[in-house]
């Protein structure tokens, strides 16, 4: 199998490149604007190119990669934010730059003659705070927009409904046949060797296949994973595994609510 490659947006001090290297993936380039984090990643990943400010990048001019990762600024979505401007905010709204870059990369690959599962990037990863489940108007609208924006990289006309009236759950998935899949779940720092109650969302999309839920929910031994957290991970994986469908997001959501005693 050819070696996978990755591009990292909002790179910070290189968390995604570090994870990539530990899993046999090559980080090819990164986008970051702060000088100190760039110095850190230049030291740790000397072969990784730095491509600059995401708002000034053109995806068609970037080296193609198999995986695109990013943790867009979370301040406007965080419950600690004073205004909670969400995706309408100047910082958290940079999420749409990740969508733009991904689309431009894929469009350029299609022009090169690629199609189907060979179009790059095939995999899309996004990390953010759990506050995105509740930010936006109406309540939780921002996460619906996130899901819809990513799904439209595959199908430009698709619409993702709101999970009215219950709100978003910390784990879930969407699949469009065998040609697109998306999964998200909450990660809790106390199970990953960090003595903090720091909760984050990790979202993975397979833009050309059905592997997103397998990537995100199948348990495997990862660096820093404590045995005490294994049961929690496996419980989440088991609770969502049977919920994936090819046709009905609303059926999946209703099923989850019934399991939780909400309906």
Q: Where do the model's predicted regions map?
A:
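Class I SAM-dependent methyltransferase "Motif I" SAM/SAH-binding loop
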Residues: 8-14
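Short alpha-helix immediately C-terminal to the canonical SAM-binding loop
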Residues: 36-39
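Class I S-adenosyl-L-methionine
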Residues: 57-65, 77-263
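Conserved acidic E/D residue at the C-terminus of a beta-strand in Rossmann-like folds
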Residues: 31-34, 127-128
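Short SAM/SAH-binding signature in class I
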Residues: 65-71
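Conserved SAM-binding strand-loop segment of SAM-dependent methyltransferases
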Residues: 47-53
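Extreme N-terminal starter segment of soluble prokaryotic enzymes
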Residues: 2-6
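A short, Lys/Arg-enriched amphipathic alpha-helix followed by its capping loop at the start of a domain
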Residues: 15, 19-26, 44
